[in-house]
UniProtKB/Swiss-Prot annotation:
Homodimer. HPA 3-hydroxylase consists of a reductase component HpaC and an oxygenase component HpaB. Some form of interactions between the reductase and the oxygenase facilitate the transfer of FADH(-) to the oxygenase in P.aeruginosa, although interactions are not required in other species. NCBIfam families: HpaB-2 (TIGR02310). The gene is hpaB. Keywords: Aromatic hydrocarbons catabolism, FAD, Flavoprotein, Monooxygenase, Oxidoreductase. It comes from the Bacteria. The keyword Oxidoreductase applies. Its EC number is 1.14.14.9. This is 4-hydroxyphenylacetate 3-monooxygenase oxygenase component. GO terms for biological process: phenylacetate catabolic process. Disulfide bonds: none annotated. The keyword ATP-binding does not apply. It comes from Pseudomonas aeruginosa (strain ATCC 15692 / DSM 22644 / CIP 104116 / JCM 14847 / LMG 12228 / 1C / PRS 101 / PAO1).
Amino acid sequence: MKPEDFRASATRPFTGEEYLASLRDDREIYIYGDRVKDVTSHPAFRNAAASMARLYDALHDPQSKEKLCWETDTGNGGYTHKFFRYARSADELRQQRDAIAEWSRLTYGWMGRTPDYKAAFGSALGANPGFYGRFEDNAKTWYKRIQEACLYLNHAIVNPPIDRDKPVDQVKDVFISVDEEVDGGIVVSGAKVVATNSALTHYNFVGQGSAQLLGDNTDFALMFIAPMNTPGMKLICRPSYELVAGIAGSPFDYPLSSRFDENDAILVMDKVFIPWENVLIYRDFERCKQWFPQGGFGRLFPMQGCTRLAVKLDFITGALYKALQCTGSLEFRGVQAQVGEVVAWRNLFWSLTDAMYGNASEWHGGAFLPSAEALQAYRVLAPQAYPEIKKTIEQVVASGLIYLPSGVRDLHNPQLDKYLSTYCRGSGGMGHRERIKILKLLWDAIGSEFGGRHELYEINYAGSQDEIRMQALRQAIGSGAMKGMLGMVEQCMGDYDENGWTVPHLHNPDDINVLDRIRQ
């Protein structure tokens, strides 16, 4: 049974309930040494799953459906999330940006690998299926399937960080490669990372990152899609922040960790059968190398990522402001200046999303893609911005972030609460419970293990720091922008030579130059 078969109607996306039901498919998820029987009820995953289900319910809610959805283009007469159907104009890209933002606000920007993230991949399949050569029909089929149901895909495209100085074909015992061709498909084995939130997805796309050395062995030159319950495919998860928050605290203590933890995992494939209809690239080095720059995903996912980050910075900026209201620090000029810098970062990323659709360009199949210049700026600047914002919060909120009781149970102890009401009260008449609630929220955002993981996530979201800068340079050269910049400099240098100005509208200083008079 396919995940989309859990829907009561084939003309609409999953509801939240149908989405949760589709995850109960005997997938192999392991955490703390045990196999998870049901990710929708296991305390390591259940609130994250419920948060994801809420996104699906929003697609059907009359209050949000119009903002989030439009008609499919597959001929099924249904509707879908706007980012699951490729845009045919700059204005449609704007509508997609707004739909991404609307969905992201339901998690306050804290879940990055929501279904619309990989919708960037699905949309590109429909706009440019010819990129996949002999697997073009597979691309068309997957575009239709992903769009009509709003299937939840994730990807695992990074090889485990082992012998990174060697081409992949020299680490054959670790990296995913073809074992053999069999009747109806291929058998593959190996591992990929970091399969973020894959425990809660329907399918995983397995491919190659943009900066990996592929070597000469075509066994590694492949890309495919696999259902999460494929026999032989396993996820080995990192510790669950949701579970730890439940064991050692409460929603009051860990309001973000408790519900928005996207568990990262090692994806292991042990002789997994992949039918030909799920293969997109096979033994083709050139297509693997060109997939990121030419396949479309590399131009679409940054709009989802930048919009999601902008929503997240709305939240972080608001939480910072409230925290400073707690401490009474907002009246200080220096603090106001630092908060203003955080606001400027927030404004920058919203402005980049405007530029992405505002300077869009037409691509294959009548599709419009976001501005390459704007998305490259986002990919380079976001990893710089997030640590700077975190540092600012640590500086201006300072000890307020840890000047807190251990947990909500301290508030329930009358002997302790009477002290907390005095020594942990907020400024300007704010009660101690409100102050503690605000500062615990901000600590969970930046200081808890959940918060630390988010900093790592944002720093490495787009990949290697060197590579994203080199891609920005290559884009400037390839687009002709660098030629224009050089031309401006050359034009300036052409305005003068060693004898003075070469343009007729300027005056040489022969009549006033003192050095010439002295020399005479």
